[in-house]
């Protein structure tokens, strides 16, 4: 098996056992990037090769000296381009931040560096994380490694495509309305969105502050649980960070779901769900039932109100958060302007893409004095009711099971021509963010075109262990599949 086909934890073990050096692991990933990046375009910025190899040597020395012995030491990782990395371009895939090099590093990324992971580069995304296809990036479209004519999903499409294509061993993404789970589903990888407040948002360039959460993207459940243990921490620099009682997630990696109560919302299986996706999800539920889980259908109310509530809240928060990008202190500044007001106007008009402008305008509208009560406050009340509906469901169930997306990856260009259809595609993921819950997408088959399908598992707040346990048990019945594109002759594992 090639180095780039190993899981992150397996590679970490081989490095520790001196079967593979950190430099060999990094070189294998760099060779893979050279081979496939021209087709996939998963990265916006790749770190300087010499610097990365030098870092690999430093980490190797620390491993040899016994200073680093964690499971991710020496493992190459990619970081979504909305997380600050000191001295390394952080663009949010937007023209307005085309020259922005932060003076500090995001807390989650710092935690990975402390764990000894080697950062290879920054991955492409929908501009400011606004989109579900990674087509709104100012730096080109990322393609799905399973079929280059299809999108990888979004907004963490670059991270998920990079993992699927073997261009890193794991990646960090962010999830505001499904931006880890949906592209993980489309790219056939595993993605975990933790409970809101579990991973520090310090250094994450904000889209919807009450919804954003950083999480791992990897080849399997073991990797995701291990990475989450490394990045989760209480951080007083983030006012929404939560001091959890328990930061252990890997103890849930047991193949035992006997007696686990799993609920399937009938509302998730109505009109608009692709029949092949439905079949794969119900087959996955059957597998868990055969392993001893108690699986039953139930009614989860208010699902149909999640999308309007989400877009009102997220866009309102975005219009406020993105007000700081005005060309004054950092980022892009328009040329040939007349006066300060004109500079603001030209900078923002030229710097932001169409989708970002659409959401800023929508957000400004719902926050305006005549409409604040009618839209924004109503959306907040709906959000509270959705959380209540989930609370009621979790009184009875340990895990909620359903699809991560209503379909497999659409063709490039299909979604941008119909933004409303793209928004509706988030139907199964959005309510998880509104309620602040943990959610996970695990590969559960492919459709007739060979495109991956993702199973979504949802847990109660701070109950990541339940979804990890269910996902791990299900995963034992399947083998990880990599797309053909992700296989090259170089970088054989010993």
Role assignments for model-derived ranges:
Residues 12-13, 302-303, 326-434, 484-491:
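Serine-dependent amide/ester hydrolase catalytic core
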